[in-house]
Amino acid sequence: METERRIITSCSAMTALFLFMTALMASSSIAATPTQSFEDNFNIMWSENHFTTSDDGEIWNLSLDNDTGCGFQTKHMYRFGWFSMKLKLVGGDSAGVVTAYYMCSENGAGPERDEIDFEFLGNRTGQPYIIQTNVYKNGTGNREMRHSLWFDPTKDYHTYSILWNNHQLVFFVDRVPIRVYKNSDKVPNNDFFPNQKPMYLFSSIWNADDWATRGGLEKTDWKKAPFVSSYKDFAVEGCRWKDPFPACVSTTTENWWDQYDAWHLSKTQKMDYAWVQRNLVVYDYCKDSERFPTLPWECSISPWA
């Protein structure tokens, strides 16, 4: 989940408001029902004493202090599906703090891992959060995009979702597609699209003040600790990987998330996606010719198909 280029800009208030209203009016057929309790779905990865729940067990909190952060992962692996969670991010001065919500084929940063990332980059009080997304295939990432948001993600819960099938990866915020990452059989060797390895879903909070905020210029203010991110309403509709004969190797399309309508954006989603591209994109590796004099193969694939 490293990054090499840090660029931060902001969109105008009027543009953000317009997009917000557009998103509110957008319709979508995507739906998923929250599934069971935290204990049914997840294990704590480390620092259990930095994990708390609400009295009813429906809200889960991860905290970071100057000793350690905390993280959890699903008990099961999946290959393709719809994965969704509501998050409320660290409020106030969160510079240097990263909340990560991602899928990975390994429990750790292995050299051959596949990975699909949401990373929420904290900032000084009053400055906007930035969402960074990234995609890894066989240990190679460097496919960062960054977006600003049309709301304050620290004030309330918002839904962050991943649609993953063999045709596309789509990152959603409140049902609005902010990034579309396509597969293609026209690209040689397919060294860019993660479609072979099953993945766990993870979330964690950790200190990344060497790069997360203004390229590392803004450091974490530990006087403001603990920093807390909150979660609820995890939902998954995916193919659970079960050895030795996982059903996920099948090429059938019985599930909605792997049928034709899920292979591309709907007309309404394309409208929302177009507004995001025009107004909220902060950085796109496919447009960084200084970093990539020869752009990666996948940058030539249209997200609109």
Swiss-Prot record:
Subcellular location, record wording: Secreted, Cell wall; Secreted, Extracellular space, Apoplast
Residues bearing attached sugar chains per UniProt: N61, N66, N123, N138
Catalytic activity from the UniProt record: breaks a beta-(1->4) bond in the backbone of a xyloglucan and transfers the xyloglucanyl segment on to O-4 of the non-reducing terminal glucose residue of an acceptor, which can be a xyloglucan or an oligosaccharide of xyloglucan
Enzyme nomenclature, EC number: 2.4.1.207
Record-linked InterPro entries: Beta-glucanase/XTH, Beta_glucanase, ConA-like_dom_sf, GH16, GH16_AS, XET_C, XTH
Protein name: Probable xyloglucan endotransglucosylase/hydrolase protein 8
Family stated for the protein in its record: Belongs to the glycosyl hydrolase 16 family. XTH group 1 subfamily.
Bilayer-crossing regions: none
Broad class of where this protein is predominantly found: secreted
Active site: E115 (nucleophile), E119 (proton donor)
Binding site for xyloglucan: E119, Q132, T133, N134, N142, R143, E144, D210, W211, G215, R291
Matches recorded under Gene3D superfamilies: 2.60.120.200
